[in-house]
Amino acid sequence: MTDPQTVSAAVAKLYDTYPFPPEPLLDEPPPGYNWRWNWLAAYSFCTGQKPQQEAIRILDAGCGTGVSTEYLVHLNPQAQVTAIDISAGTLAVATERCQRSSADRVQFHHLSLYDADQLPGEFDLINSVGVLHHLPDPQRGIRALATKLAPGGIMHIFVYAELGRWEIKLMQEAIALLQGEQQGDYRDGVQVGRQIFAALPEANRLVKREQERWSLENQRDECFADMYVHPQEIDYTIETLFELIAASGLEFIGFSNPRSWQLEPLLGKNPALLERAQALSDRQRYRLVELLNPEAVTHYEFFLGRSPLPKADWSEDATLLAAVPDRNPCMDGWESRCLFNF
C-alpha cells in the first residue's frame, strides 16, 4: 500500500471501525491534567518564563475522539481551539465528548494534516500526538503544520520509536501474513492477533513483552487494533527523528521527558564512560541512550518552536530577584494552599 490516498482511506476506515482513543465520555471536565496541554506550563518549559498572553489559538492536529481536545479546552480557559481529523467517525465521538463536558470553545474540521493550510490564521500552540507516524509522508505533514505555527509559537509532537516497538512490528507482520486477503478487515485482524497471543507459549518473547508493557490498555479492542493492525506506521530512531524535525524548519526545543534521556542511570557506575560521553553531541548522547536502553524508548515526545522564541536566563541574581513568581498550574491536580505536599 503506497498510494497516499489509498493509505489515508485505510487509516480513516480503521478509526471509523475502532474510534481511538476509547476513553469514556463524561458529563464533566476530564480528571487531572497533562501539563504538555496546558499553555502556561508548556510555554514555561520551553522558554523558562510565563507567556505574556493566555488568549491564544490552539490547533489539535489529528484529534481522534477528542480526548486531547477536551483537555486543551478545559486546561486553557482563554484559548480558542481548532481540532482536525481524517476520520468522520472519531470526529463524531469528539464532538459529543466536548459537548457533554461543556468544552465549548472548539471548532472541529474533517481534514487531513496535509490540508492544514485550509484553516484560517496561525496558532500559538499546535498539538499532534500519535498522528505523524501514521501518514504516508510524515515530512509533508509536519511541514504543513509548521506553516500554521505563529512566530513565537510552540508545537508538541509525539511519534513512535523503532527500538522499543520491535516486538510490536513482528506481531503486526505475523497478523498480516495470517490474514492474507482479509488484511484490511480490522475486526478480523484483532481476532487473529488475540488468537496468536493465546496460542503462543508463555515464555515467548512477544507474549512476555505484551504482558509486561501493553496488555492492560490492549484489553480494549480499539487499543489492540491501533497497535497491531494499523495499515500505516513509520517508526523512528534518533537519526530519522531529527530528519523529520529538520523538514519542519522549526527549532528543536527539547524532549518533554528530559530525565529519560540522561546517561547517569545507565552509565553512572563508571564515571570514565560518562566522561567520554561528555565529548558527544546532544544528538549522539540521545542515540547512545536509546541503544543502551531500547525497551524504554517506545516513543519520542518533544517540543518545536518558531522564532522569535524567548529563552529566559536566570543565572543573574538581579534578574531572579526582579522576577514575579507565579504558581505553576500543573504543580498539583487540584488547588492547594501548600507549595509541597509531604
Please place each PLM-identified region on the residue numbering.
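Conserved alpha-helix/loop element of class I SAM-dependent methyltransferases that forms part
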Residues: T17, D27-I56, Y71
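Conserved SAM-binding loop of SAM-dependent methyltransferases across substrates and taxa
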Residues: T65-P77
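Conserved SAM/SAH-binding beta-strand->alpha-helix loop
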Residues: S87
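Conserved SAM-binding strand-loop segment of SAM-dependent methyltransferases
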Residues: S102-Y114
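A short acidic, Gly/Pro-enriched loop at the edge of an enzyme's catalytic core
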Residues: D117-L125
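A short glycine-rich, Lys/Arg-flanked "PGG" loop and its adjoining helix->strand segment in the class I
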Residues: R140-P151
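Conserved class I S-adenosyl-L-methionine
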Residues: I154-L206
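Rossmann-like AdoMet/SAM-dependent catalytic core
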Residues: E212-F342
